[in-house]
A protein has these predicted regions:
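Structural signature of tandem-repeat unit edges
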Residues: 9-23, 33-46, 56-69, 78-92, ...
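Consensus positions within tandem repeat domains that build extended binding/scaffold surfaces
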Residues: 2-7, 25-30, 48-53, 71-76, ...
Length: 200
Protein backbone atom coordinates (compact mmCIF):
# COMPACT_ATOMS: atom_id res chain seq x y z
CA UNK A 1 0.00 0.00 0.00
CA UNK A 2 1.55 3.30 -1.10
CA UNK A 3 2.42 6.30 1.03
CA UNK A 4 -0.53 8.29 2.40
CA UNK A 5 -2.92 6.10 0.38
CA UNK A 6 -5.78 6.46 2.87
CA UNK A 7 -4.62 9.41 4.99
CA UNK A 8 -7.34 11.67 6.41
CA UNK A 9 -10.14 9.30 5.38
CA UNK A 10 -12.20 10.31 8.39
CA UNK A 11 -15.24 8.17 7.53
CA UNK A 12 -13.22 4.96 7.28
CA UNK A 13 -14.20 2.70 10.19
CA UNK A 14 -12.70 -0.68 9.33
CA UNK A 15 -10.38 -2.24 6.81
CA UNK A 16 -9.26 -5.76 6.00
CA UNK A 17 -5.95 -5.78 4.14
CA UNK A 18 -5.66 -8.64 1.60
CA UNK A 19 -2.94 -11.30 1.68
CA UNK A 20 -1.35 -9.83 -1.44
CA UNK A 21 -0.04 -6.85 0.56
CA UNK A 22 3.50 -7.12 1.93
CA UNK A 23 4.12 -3.57 3.12
CA UNK A 24 2.13 -0.81 4.82
CA UNK A 25 3.96 2.32 3.73
CA UNK A 26 4.65 5.60 5.49
CA UNK A 27 1.59 7.69 6.43
CA UNK A 28 -0.84 5.15 4.91
CA UNK A 29 -3.65 5.66 7.43
CA UNK A 30 -2.62 8.96 9.08
CA UNK A 31 -5.48 10.69 10.93
CA UNK A 32 -8.18 8.17 10.01
CA UNK A 33 -9.92 9.36 13.14
CA UNK A 34 -12.87 6.94 12.99
CA UNK A 35 -10.90 3.82 12.18
CA UNK A 36 -11.72 1.28 14.90
CA UNK A 37 -10.76 -2.03 13.33
CA UNK A 38 -8.00 -3.20 11.03
CA UNK A 39 -6.87 -6.68 10.05
CA UNK A 40 -3.22 -7.03 9.06
CA UNK A 41 -2.55 -10.26 7.13
CA UNK A 42 0.37 -12.62 7.61
CA UNK A 43 1.89 -11.44 4.34
CA UNK A 44 2.90 -8.01 5.73
CA UNK A 45 6.54 -7.68 6.78
CA UNK A 46 6.88 -3.94 7.42
CA UNK A 47 4.73 -1.22 8.96
CA UNK A 48 6.01 2.18 7.86
CA UNK A 49 6.65 5.47 9.61
CA UNK A 50 3.48 7.18 10.85
CA UNK A 51 1.40 4.39 9.26
CA UNK A 52 -1.43 4.75 11.81
CA UNK A 53 -0.47 8.14 13.28
CA UNK A 54 -3.39 9.74 15.16
CA UNK A 55 -5.92 7.00 14.47
CA UNK A 56 -7.58 8.15 17.66
CA UNK A 57 -10.42 5.58 17.77
CA UNK A 58 -8.31 2.51 17.12
CA UNK A 59 -8.57 0.37 20.26
CA UNK A 60 -6.68 -2.81 19.42
CA UNK A 61 -4.07 -4.10 17.02
CA UNK A 62 -2.67 -7.57 16.43
CA UNK A 63 0.58 -7.56 14.51
CA UNK A 64 1.18 -10.87 12.71
CA UNK A 65 4.30 -13.03 13.04
CA UNK A 66 5.41 -12.01 9.56
CA UNK A 67 6.18 -8.42 10.61
CA UNK A 68 9.82 -7.65 11.43
CA UNK A 69 9.82 -3.85 11.43
CA UNK A 70 7.56 -1.12 12.88
CA UNK A 71 8.46 2.41 11.80
CA UNK A 72 8.88 5.70 13.64
CA UNK A 73 5.65 7.09 15.10
CA UNK A 74 3.72 4.16 13.58
CA UNK A 75 0.94 4.28 16.20
CA UNK A 76 1.79 7.67 17.72
CA UNK A 77 -1.13 9.44 19.42
CA UNK A 78 -3.53 6.54 18.89
CA UNK A 79 -4.87 7.64 22.23
CA UNK A 80 -7.46 4.86 22.66
CA UNK A 81 -5.18 2.03 21.57
CA UNK A 82 -5.14 -0.26 24.60
CA UNK A 83 -4.72 -3.84 23.36
CA UNK A 84 -1.50 -4.43 21.44
CA UNK A 85 -0.02 -7.76 20.40
CA UNK A 86 3.56 -7.62 19.14
CA UNK A 87 5.16 -10.92 18.04
CA UNK A 88 8.74 -11.98 18.71
CA UNK A 89 9.43 -11.63 14.99
CA UNK A 90 9.58 -7.84 15.38
CA UNK A 91 13.22 -6.88 15.78
CA UNK A 92 13.12 -3.21 14.78
CA UNK A 93 10.82 -0.64 16.40
CA UNK A 94 11.16 3.01 15.43
CA UNK A 95 11.18 6.12 17.58
CA UNK A 96 8.02 6.83 19.57
CA UNK A 97 6.14 4.07 17.72
CA UNK A 98 3.59 3.63 20.52
CA UNK A 99 3.83 6.93 22.39
CA UNK A 100 0.53 8.56 23.25
CA UNK A 101 -1.32 5.21 23.46
CA UNK A 102 -3.19 3.74 26.42
CA UNK A 103 -1.19 0.55 25.96
CA UNK A 104 2.02 2.36 26.82
CA UNK A 105 0.66 4.68 29.51
CA UNK A 106 -1.10 1.81 31.31
CA UNK A 107 1.72 -0.71 30.92
CA UNK A 108 2.11 -2.32 34.36
CA UNK A 109 5.90 -2.01 34.62
CA UNK A 110 8.31 0.93 34.42
CA UNK A 111 10.34 -1.00 31.84
CA UNK A 112 8.34 -1.73 28.68
CA UNK A 113 10.00 -4.91 27.39
CA UNK A 114 8.76 -7.21 24.63
CA UNK A 115 8.99 -11.00 24.82
CA UNK A 116 12.00 -11.01 22.52
CA UNK A 117 13.93 -8.69 24.84
CA UNK A 118 13.48 -5.34 23.09
CA UNK A 119 13.18 -2.49 25.58
CA UNK A 120 10.77 0.04 24.05
CA UNK A 121 10.56 2.63 26.81
CA UNK A 122 11.26 3.46 30.43
CA UNK A 123 8.41 5.12 32.33
CA UNK A 124 9.93 5.34 35.81
CA UNK A 125 11.40 8.23 37.77
CA UNK A 126 14.23 6.44 39.58
CA UNK A 127 17.67 8.06 39.53
CA UNK A 128 19.75 4.87 39.68
CA UNK A 129 18.59 1.93 37.58
CA UNK A 130 19.70 -1.49 36.44
CA UNK A 131 18.01 -2.50 33.22
CA UNK A 132 16.32 -5.95 33.53
CA UNK A 133 18.45 -8.97 32.65
CA UNK A 134 15.91 -10.08 30.02
CA UNK A 135 16.69 -7.09 27.79
CA UNK A 136 18.72 -7.79 24.63
CA UNK A 137 18.21 -4.52 22.74
CA UNK A 138 17.50 -0.92 23.79
CA UNK A 139 15.11 0.75 21.38
CA UNK A 140 15.51 4.18 19.79
CA UNK A 141 14.79 6.96 22.31
CA UNK A 142 13.87 4.45 25.04
CA UNK A 143 15.29 6.71 27.79
CA UNK A 144 15.39 10.04 25.95
CA UNK A 145 14.87 13.05 28.23
CA UNK A 146 14.71 10.96 31.43
CA UNK A 147 15.98 13.85 33.52
CA UNK A 148 15.71 11.94 36.80
CA UNK A 149 18.26 9.37 35.64
CA UNK A 150 21.77 9.70 37.11
CA UNK A 151 23.23 6.20 36.73
CA UNK A 152 22.39 3.23 34.53
CA UNK A 153 23.76 -0.31 34.34
CA UNK A 154 23.12 -2.23 31.14
CA UNK A 155 22.88 -6.06 31.46
CA UNK A 156 25.11 -8.62 29.78
CA UNK A 157 22.61 -9.80 27.15
CA UNK A 158 22.25 -6.40 25.47
CA UNK A 159 23.87 -6.27 22.02
CA UNK A 160 22.63 -2.93 20.67
CA UNK A 161 21.75 0.56 21.90
CA UNK A 162 19.43 2.42 19.53
CA UNK A 163 19.46 5.91 18.07
CA UNK A 164 19.15 8.63 20.71
CA UNK A 165 18.44 5.96 23.34
CA UNK A 166 19.65 8.18 26.20
CA UNK A 167 19.54 11.53 24.43
CA UNK A 168 19.24 14.60 26.67
CA UNK A 169 19.32 12.69 29.95
CA UNK A 170 20.65 15.89 31.46
CA UNK A 171 21.49 14.46 34.91
CA UNK A 172 23.04 11.18 33.78
CA UNK A 173 26.57 11.00 35.21
CA UNK A 174 27.60 7.36 34.75
CA UNK A 175 26.82 4.42 32.51
CA UNK A 176 28.14 0.86 32.48
CA UNK A 177 28.09 -0.87 29.09
CA UNK A 178 28.87 -4.63 28.94
CA UNK A 179 31.15 -6.46 26.49
CA UNK A 180 28.09 -7.92 24.77
CA UNK A 181 27.20 -4.57 23.18
CA UNK A 182 28.39 -4.50 19.57
CA UNK A 183 26.46 -1.47 18.34
CA UNK A 184 25.94 1.99 19.86
CA UNK A 185 23.84 3.96 17.39
CA UNK A 186 23.72 7.58 16.32
CA UNK A 187 23.19 10.09 19.11
CA UNK A 188 22.80 7.39 21.76
CA UNK A 189 24.10 9.67 24.53
CA UNK A 190 23.87 13.01 22.76
CA UNK A 191 23.12 15.93 25.06
CA UNK A 192 24.05 14.06 28.26
CA UNK A 193 25.90 17.15 29.49
CA UNK A 194 26.82 15.73 32.91
CA UNK A 195 28.03 12.31 31.77
CA UNK A 196 31.49 11.94 33.30
CA UNK A 197 31.95 8.17 33.66
CA UNK A 198 31.50 5.57 30.93
CA UNK A 199 32.59 1.98 31.51
CA UNK A 200 32.76 -0.13 28.35
Amino acid sequence: IGEAAFSDCNSLESIAIPDSVTNISNHTFVSCSNLTSITIPGSVTDIGNCAFYECTNLTSITIPDSVTSIGNLAFYKCENLKDVTIPESVTDIGEYAFYGTKWLSEYPDDFVVLKNGILIAYKGKESIISIPDSVTSICNRAFAKCNSLTSVTIPDLVTSIGNSAFESCSNLTSVTIPDSVTSISYGAFQGCDNLTSVTI
